[in-house]
Every structure is written in structure tokens, then in C-alpha cells.
Amino acid sequence: MIEADRLIQPQIQAQDESIDRAMRPKMLDEYTGQDDTRAQLKVFIQAAKNRNEALDHMLIYGPPGLGKTTLAMIVANEMGVNIKSTSGPVLEKAGDLAALLTNLESGDVLFIDEIHRLSPVVEEILYPAMEDYQLDIMIGEGPAARSIKLDLPPFTLVGATTRAGALTSPLRARFGIPLRLEFYNIKDLSTIVTRSAQVMELDIDAEGAFEIARRSRGTPRIANRLLRRVRDYAQVKHDGAVTKFVAEHALDLLDVDSEGFDYMDRKLLLAIIDKFMGGPVGLDNLAAAIGEERETIEDVLEPFLIQQGFIQRTPRGRIATARAYQHFELIKPE
């Protein structure tokens, strides 16, 4: 299994939570990047406020670490309502969801992270709640059991997932606002790094922020994590200020290279190049070659490598691109 503490892992780590919370923007105007999504949300939120209605149900999907939870909180702040947060695996029984729904006030946001992992029995309860703001509850057991309907206040369900394709069709169809988050460009990440440094009261120049941003794999969570580690290096080895020189040396020490790759990324790419002559190679063979599960490759390692043009998916398997060979200063065979 892949190590849970990879520095450039986009999934949240225990030490991220409290620090990320302090760095999160609170309103849309403070939110950097995702321009199309931000523009859409401004329209939808203003329209709902003008009509004095709850915002339509929203599905936010995309790779981990891009700000799905942050966006859900911003939606609640912009609407001026409360937010209750949970996750799909936590809602094991219908009663778990019913307890949350019955405590919502009019217009509130219910945020369910990893919504693709909801159990079928919980999902069934969610359908009438989303469509009709009604909760169907079974009272009693056996032959004496009967169903009663409870009216719920209008609310907004915000679901977040890294695997939109894993949602059932009936659930996916009930979201009126689907929003896909993309990897961030370096310019926007530099802005995020600079803002986070200000929150941390850390002296950083534009080149230092850029160097951290370009090694952050298009992911704000990784950028903030790298910033904290570069800060440590700057305070111990230098005068505490983060320059390009300091950032380069700190990240080289941390084994995060110029493309934001760590040893696992290099291991995957070199396996395709060396063991399978550049590909194509099937996912199962590749997983066996590097000692990882196929889901880890698909969900954790591959997305960024494909998006950046280092791996190509074909019907016959994965292929290392010319850019992958260039990264390792190798010549791609004809």
C-alpha cells in the first residue's frame, strides 16, 4: 500500500486540518482560481437570495485537495446560513441521516463529503428529502411497521466526491448544480501560497512563492503543506525568509522535484519506461510491477501524470509519453 504520509499526497492528513481551516477563504471574492466555477456560483447564489429560496442541490467533484470542502463552506457563508458537515462512510444507517436532516433550519447547507460512499439504504432516504423536502420514516417493526412522512425545511445538499462516476444515476440526477474543479495553474497557486504566507506571518517573495507553486501539482492543499515545510527549512537553515533559493533547496531536500514528483511518481513512470519499454502496459501488470493496488494508481498517482502529459491512456494500456522520457533525460525509442 502507498504510504499515507507522502508529502505531495493530495488527500488530507491529520496535521492539515486545523492549519488548512485557518487558511481557507470565507467568501467567493477571497477565493482564488476555478474562474468558471466561481462565476457560475455567483449567479446561482445571487438568484437564490433574490428569490429568498434555498440554493439548488450541488455536486462538487474533482481530484482531492482542490477545495471542495472550502467551496461548500463559502456557499453557506454567502447564503448566510448554517452548514452541517458529514461524510458518506459515517452515515451507516438511515437514522444517522434522519438525525441530521431533522435538525436543519430553513436554507441550511448539508455537506456530505465522499458522497459516492453512501450506503444504498441511506441513499434511498435521501431521494425524497432532496426532491420533496420530505423524510420517509418507518415506525415499528414487523407487521405493525408503518411509514410516516415528515416535512423538512428547504435545504441545500452539497455533495463532494473524487469519483463522480461512482455515484448512482438516480442520485447524480438529483443535483441541479454540478461543478467540476480542475487542477490550478501556477499563477493562481502562487497567489494562494502568498496569501497563506501572510496568514502565517511569513516573509516570502514572488519567486519563492512561484517555486513552491510549480512543485505543488496544481493542488492548493499540497501547496500549503509544502509552504509549511519550506518555512521550517527557512527558519532553521536561513534567516526565516522564503526566497527562490531557499524554496529550491528545501524542496530538493524533501525529494520533491521540479515537476512536483516524489519517488512514487518516478517509480511509476520508470516502471513503464524500463520494465515495459514505454508501454502500452495494462493496469494490473503495472500495479504488480510497482507493488501497489490498481485503485491507488487510478485514483492517486495517475490523474496528475495524465493531466500533465507524462502518461497516456490507450485501449491497450498506459504509455509513457515523450515528456516522461525528457524528464529523466532519456531518449524515447522510435
From Swiss-Prot:
UniProt cross-references to CDD domains, sorted A to Z: AAA
Gene Ontology biological process terms, A to Z: DNA recombination; DNA repair
Intracellular or extracellular location(s): Cytoplasm
Leading EC class: hydrolase
Cellular component per GO, a single term: Holliday junction resolvase complex
Protein keywords: ATP-binding, Cytoplasm, DNA damage, DNA recombination, DNA repair, DNA-binding, Hydrolase, Nucleotide-binding
Record bears the keyword Cytoplasm: yes
Annotated EC: 3.6.4.-
Gene3D superfamilies named among the record's database cross-references: 1.10.8.60, P-loop containing nucleotide triphosphate hydrolases, Winged helix-like DNA-binding domain superfamily/Winged helix DNA-binding domain
Positions with a binding annotation for Mg(2+): 69
Subunit text: Homohexamer. Forms an RuvA(8)-RuvB(12)-Holliday junction (HJ) complex. HJ DNA is sandwiched between 2 RuvA tetramers; dsDNA enters through RuvA and exits via RuvB. An RuvB hexamer assembles on each DNA strand where it exits the tetramer. Each RuvB hexamer is contacted by two RuvA subunits (via domain III) on 2 adjacent RuvB subunits; this complex drives branch migration. In the full resolvosome a probable DNA-RuvA(4)-RuvB(12)-RuvC(2) complex forms which resolves the HJ.
Record-given protein name: Holliday junction branch migration complex subunit RuvB
Phylogenetic placement of the source organism: Bacteria, Pseudomonadati, Pseudomonadota, Gammaproteobacteria, Alteromonadales
